[in-house]
Amino acid sequence: MRQSLIYNSIEVIAYNLNRQNNSLKLFELGKIYGKHNNKYLEERRLCISIVGEVFQMNWNIQQSPDTFFYGKGLIIDLFETFGYNNLKFNNVDHPDFVFACEISSQNIILGYYGLVSMKKREKYNIEKEIYLADINWSRFIENCFTKPTYFKDLPKFPSIKRDFALL
């Protein structure tokens, strides 16, 4: 029984890096187990990890964006899709990260995001930076869609754009 998805994610990243897959965007959804105040806990967690270049270089993309902010944007998009609009990232100390942000909404801690510490990466001989998000999926699902979702009918006719040139 595992207590965190972080170590398994780092192991998968090491496996892929050893096989020359240098740019990775991975996720894992699973259960973790633990004990808190003489009670046994079982929680679902979502672990998102990003390593290497975010986009492949081509004529249109000269420089890849900063991986930290790409991951933060990915997390914000995920949360907004499920109805979280007032998301906060607060800097905290976390034993698994060099620097970490606590992801919270309405004073409910939903997870952590940051750069995995060198100590954790050295165990698997990984030199590249690993940005990882550990989201408490059980808590995430309980609190999503607090507002009702509204849908609009699709248009019956396709949109028409006209360009008039008058002389």
Question: Where does each model-flagged region fall?
Answer:
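Extended beta-strand-rich architecture
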Residues: 1-167
